[in-house]
């Protein structure tokens, strides 16, 4: 009898993607983050769905509906904090996943990589809009500051901002549309993730060496399914430790104050996972320049395949590039720290230096290091 999983039209797709998929025999735990991102997305959609059942997207009642969820809804508090901290876990996995791609040269799979960059943008947009929904002080002022950046676009900027706001300031119309977009975007992300996987399975996975592994493949199940389950258990453990012991650790105390357009918080800052980009934005005195730098700090990932000058794909055997990669990681951590600090000396200077270093590393130093490594190996 022919196995049903290999013949049934639907089961066949699942089988080819998760069971009989030929996978390299040497992929490390850095390859776990793809499945962890899938779990994060499912978790966010499910918790978000239950939150949406009790939330009201109206400026008069939004803040109180979130309070109601936490106080009156059965297990509402755990759903709310799983959703809020789930977003943090999502971004930790995202940054690890992108970092893995940079380190091991996975960006040479062009379609997979570019869809990944679109996924990153979509996830950032979703998270930003989600942060606005509780309608606390930081929600309101974060939305005001970030949407206002679009006014830097020449000629159409002001009209564009008012169009997004649905009026002359962040108000009821803005909150309603942000809720609508925040609800629909995760499903678009899920669809894009499927396309991401589709293109990945056209080429097969990369591996730590960066050398083609067609001669040494193993089935995905049971080897990597069990490995992914371990990763998932660790992810859920860390998430639940965060949710049950310090649910507000990564949040902002200002968001426990209802939004007040007449009172500006002393330090307006986004969630921690946007701080690196926010620091780059703030480090440039010109508004349009700052906005361009902000967009380019993420869009620069699209250029990675063009900036790859090495004859080797992975950084596994390239010590100079490895050092620069970890300098880049340290630089991003510095930017994250600076983004949360007030705009004053010495933070301004550190932020400017870290921003220059970020673009310099990616655009100049890493390609030059790769060329030097080629010459050292006499691979001209």
From Swiss-Prot:
Record's cofactor remark: Binds 2 heme b groups non-covalently.
Cofactor(s) required, per the database record: heme b
Binding positions for heme b b562?
83, 182
Stored PROSITE patterns: CYTB_CTER (PS51003), CYTB_NTER (PS51002)
* Positions contributing to heme b b566 binding: 97, 196
Does the keyword Nucleus belong to this entry?
Answer: no
Name the positions where a ubiquinone binds. Answer: 201
- InterPro entries noted in UniProt: Cyt_b/b6_C, Cyt_b/b6_C_sf, Cyt_b/b6_N, Cytb/b6-like_sf, Cytochrome_b, Cytochrome_b_C_euk/bac, Cytochrome_b_N_euk/bac, Di-haem_cyt_TM
Q: List the disulfide bonds.
A: none
The entry's keywords = Electron transport, Heme, Iron, Membrane, Metal-binding, Mitochondrion, Mitochondrion inner membrane, Respiratory chain, Transmembrane, Transmembrane helix, Transport, Ubiquinone
Transmembrane feature ranges: 33-53, 77-98, 113-133, 178-198, 226-246, 288-308, 320-340, 347-367
**What is this entry's stated membrane topology?**
Multi-pass membrane protein
Which GO-annotated molecular functions does the record name?
metal ion binding; ubiquinol-cytochrome-c reductase activity
- What does the UniProt entry say about where the protein is found? Mitochondrion inner membrane
* Subunit architecture: The cytochrome bc1 complex contains 11 subunits: 3 respiratory subunits (MT-CYB, CYC1 and UQCRFS1), 2 core proteins (UQCRC1 and UQCRC2) and 6 low-molecular weight proteins (UQCRH/QCR6, UQCRB/QCR7, UQCRQ/QCR8, UQCR10/QCR9, UQCR11/QCR10 and a cleavage product of UQCRFS1). This cytochrome bc1 complex then forms a dimer.
What other facts are recorded?
A: Heme 1 (or BL or b562) is low-potential and absorbs at about 562 nm, and heme 2 (or BH or b566) is high-potential and absorbs at about 566 nm.
Q: Which family does it belong to?
A: Belongs to the cytochrome b family.
Its job: Component of the ubiquinol-cytochrome c reductase complex (complex III or cytochrome b-c1 complex) that is part of the mitochondrial respiratory chain. The b-c1 complex mediates electron transfer from ubiquinol to cytochrome c. Contributes to the generation of a proton gradient across the mitochondrial membrane that is then used for ATP synthesis.
List the protein's name.
Answer: Cytochrome b
Name the species this protein comes from.
Answer: Saiga tatarica
Q: Which gene encodes it?
A: MT-CYB
């Amino acid at each position: 009898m022919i196995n049903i999983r290999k013949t049934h039209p639907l089961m066949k797709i699942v089988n080819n993607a998760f069971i009989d998929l030929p996978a390299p025999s040497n992929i490390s735990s850095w390859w776990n983050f793809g499945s962890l991102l899938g779990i994060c997305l499912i978790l966010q959609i499910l918790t978000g769905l239950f939150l949406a059942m009790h939330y009201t997207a109206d400026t008069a009642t939004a803040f109180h509906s979130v309070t109601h969820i936490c106080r009156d809804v059965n297990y509402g508090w755990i759903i709310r904090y799983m959703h809020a901290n789930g977003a943090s876990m999502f971004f930790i996995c995202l940054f690890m996943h992108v970092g893995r791609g940079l380190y091991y040269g996975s960006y040479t799979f062009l379609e997979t990589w570019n869809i990944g960059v679109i996924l990153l943008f979509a996830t950032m947009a979703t998270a930003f809009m989600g942060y606005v929904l509780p309608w606390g002080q930081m929600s309101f002022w974060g939305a005001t500051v970030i949407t206002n950046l679009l006014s830097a676009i020449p000629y159409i900027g002001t009209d564009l901002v008012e169009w997004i706001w649905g009026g002359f300031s962040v108000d009821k119309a803005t909150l309603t549309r942000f809720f609508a977009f925040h609800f629909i975007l995760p499903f678009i992300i899920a669809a894009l993730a499927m396309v991401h996987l589709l293109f990945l399975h056209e080429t097969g996975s990369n591996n730590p060496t960066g050398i083609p592994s067609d001669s040494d493949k193993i089935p995905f199940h049971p080897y990597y399914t069990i490995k992914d389950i371990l990763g998932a258990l660790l992810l859920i453990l860390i998430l639940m430790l965060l949710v049950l012991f310090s649910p507000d650790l990564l949040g902002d105390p200002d968001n426990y104050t209802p939004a007040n357009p007449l009172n500006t918080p002393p330090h307006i800052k986004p969630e921690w996972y946007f701080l690196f980009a926010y620091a780059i934005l703030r480090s440039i005195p010109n508004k349009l320049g700052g906005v361009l730098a902000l967009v380019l700090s993420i869009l620069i990932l699209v250029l990675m395949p063009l900036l790859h000058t090495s004859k080797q794909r992975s950084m596994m055997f390239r010590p100079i590039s490895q050092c620069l990669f970890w300098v880049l990681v340290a630089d991003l951590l510095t930017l994250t720290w600076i983004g949360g600090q007030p705009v004053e000396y010495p933070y301004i200077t550190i932020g400017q230096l870290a921003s220059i270093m970020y673009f310099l590393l990616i655009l100049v130093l890493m390609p030059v290091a790769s060329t030097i490594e080629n010459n050292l190996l006499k691979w001209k």
